[in-house]
């Protein structure tokens, strides 16, 4: 909190309510100001509906992937699903495995499921190749990696192994050939959403298979459009994708002209209505899907893992991702209180003691996701997979308890590493003045480098790198602070790495121990160049509130409007409220003073919480009569009861 340079307080909430003529003034105000929501119809923000999802058939190579899966299953050939160890990799692998095991079209499939180990380098490394060859699959499906590993895929195809890659990571100039590469980031991808996780890609593949097996597959529709000059144009729709006549002819030429009848298309269903305004493609695809018996019923349960992957892989909660998360929350709530097929996931919800009246985005990001991720971090990814694929209630209960114990081990390891980090910077305070905060010690423990790097960013308000020894080498994580692209920095230092990769916001690498001093020596100069070239990097740490409120305005009425904009996360941050000239009363230290709970004059019974800065706040309050604060509302479920509380992100002198 003491690192904040500037706080900008937004408009008075009361003035916004007065000026905006709408039943939902908060929604209308924020939609117009949040970049990721600007082009979304407000009605679409309020629903969780399959109609808002795009057709999967604009994903590159999706048709080839379906054909390979169907043909290899029908021939009783071995299919190996190989997923990454993180939550998205586990979620995507289990989602697809569940479907393939349960659908009759794959009843003859010889299916094996495998996930990478914490000790393995990322992706199709030497160790992974060895495991794959030992398994002897006819068809390999990689989940959450593979886009940048053309050489390794060439090697596998020469061994007679066909490959499908489901991945959402950055795609290099040279992409793998001889395989079905389903990645929305491909330069030739026409899919409207680029930032979707691999669990969503698994969902898309499942929905595409169900559609492919229906009578609606390759059913052509047409519509006549008249432009402003009165000229008519016939548009064609195939499997949810719009084509001109020329594009349709090209498709026929590329395939077999006899495989697609264009002579008698069905008319576009102009009279068909949906809950929200949709573009022609989504509207027609939804219309077709509704005609398929049990289509949405089969897909409903698949949304849970798609939502978990979306949240835990920190995808932007705009566009289609919003709908996946909202659908997942509904599905998980039904799973919790009902008798659904995912016994393992249900037992995990029960062990976590979540609110049975409604699973929340916070539950996905702070409870479910970390537990699934912990297995991979602690070198026990297979335990998370075994839980999610549990077939009996007794097995599920045992595995859920085991996974929670693994997560507790992860917490203890993280705490030990953070204690070492604090001692490290106490000895070497100059390290915190560099452009990138960096920490490596030989006694650091592996598996939690991403968590530690994130906490370093939170503490020092700078990009951070944390490295720990791992199986004879070392592995590191880098996290961004602002909009800077950390992959650019890693690329400039790539000569020191064994492997590296990731996203613009978060990356990872492996490095030989003897290369670490050379890496350290080069890091500062490379970081200076990197940040000097990054014009988007903030020059100061700024907190901006969406609204300034009076204490008496913060309550259940505001919470109801607040929920219109959920789910909150990347791309759609929680609504920040500012309160000025607040007066704190009834201070209650918690956990030996580490945290603090209090009320403020005028807010009634609403509890205000400050985490990890309890002593600092109490010292501050001993000198100040009133103060300004910034934070967000939160519903807290504890011991069977739900209460509203205000989580304080920042506090400071009034008027600062």
Regions found by a protein language model. Give the residues of each.
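Hydrophobic, small-residue-rich alpha-helical packing segments that form membrane-like cores
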Residues: 98-101, 109-165, 170-198
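Long, low-complexity segments enriched in small/aliphatic residues
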Residues: 550-600
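Beta-strand/loop nucleic-acid-binding surfaces
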Residues: 604-620
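Hydrophobic helix-and-loop "lid/oligomerization" segment in the mid-to-C-terminal part
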Residues: 8-139, 159-160, 211-243, 249, ...
